[in-house]
Amino acid sequence: MASSMAPAAAMAILLLALLMPATLCSRSGPPSSKHGHGGHAKRAPPPASPVVPVAPQAAALVRATCNSTAYYDVCVSALAADPSSTTADVRGLSAIAVSVAAANASGAAQAAAALANGTAPLAAAAAGDGTVQALLRACAGKYGDARDALAAAKESMGQQDYDLATVHVSAGAEYPQVCKALFRRQRPGAYPAELAAREEALNKLCSVALDIIALLTSSPASNNNNS
């Protein structure tokens, strides 16, 4: 009996020996691979957030609108700097243009006051000249008037009174010219370069604003569809 079972037992042991490596490989293979990749997964950065499409620097309407102005590059730069310009209609673009001009006038008023008070980096030249300081204070006032005129223009545009808005923007462009004229009469050559640059920028910004407002006065109905 024992002798007859010996071959069977030997065969069973042999089969078991053959099957065990395959069984162990089938059980250990995936976990090993899983642990290997899992270790890297823990150290890997989290999945990147979905990429949000970036709006072009100048939307089609911005470019088309700026083509109607005398200073295309200034117009595109001013409007595209405001994120809302990519979804604004022409009336919205005109409001942005006026706001940019008002910000320029406000900055010029502060710069002129700083030069007059001796707190600006380039104020040393005016420190000992009472006339220049008085002129700078007058310039600060004129740029302040320009800022207020442009703020009034924006209010008029909100009421869709584009004719009055045009008057205010035109006034905003003219106030700084008084500053330059005062310097030419009383201190030729002493007009600060910073104010000269700001005056030129404000003049161009006001021109852009006026050109865009003109689009509203020429065909207001077509520009109120998105309001």
UniProtKB/Swiss-Prot annotation:
Swiss-Prot/TrEMBL keywords: Apoplast, Disulfide bond, Glycoprotein, Growth regulation, Secreted, Signal
Localization of this protein: Secreted, Extracellular space, Apoplast
Pfam families to which the protein is assigned, alphabetical: PMEI (PF04043)
Domain of life of the native organism: Eukaryota
Broad class of the protein's primary localization: secreted
Disulfide bonds: 66-75, 139-179
BP GO annotations: plant-type cell wall modification
Region (Disordered): 28-50
Assigned GO CC terms: apoplast; plant-type cell wall
InterPro entries named among the record's database cross-references: Invertase/methylesterase_inhib, Pectinesterase_inhib_dom
Biased composition (Basic residues): 34-43
Entry's induction text: Induced by cold stress. Down-regulated by drought stress.
Tissue distribution: Expressed in roots, leaves, culms and flag leaves.
Family: Belongs to the PMEI family.
Function: Pectin methylesterase (PME) inhibitor that inhibits PME in vitro. Functions as a critical structural modulator by regulating the degree of pectin methylesterification and the physiochemical properties of the cell wall components.
Protein name: Pectinesterase inhibitor 28
This protein's encoding gene: PMEI28
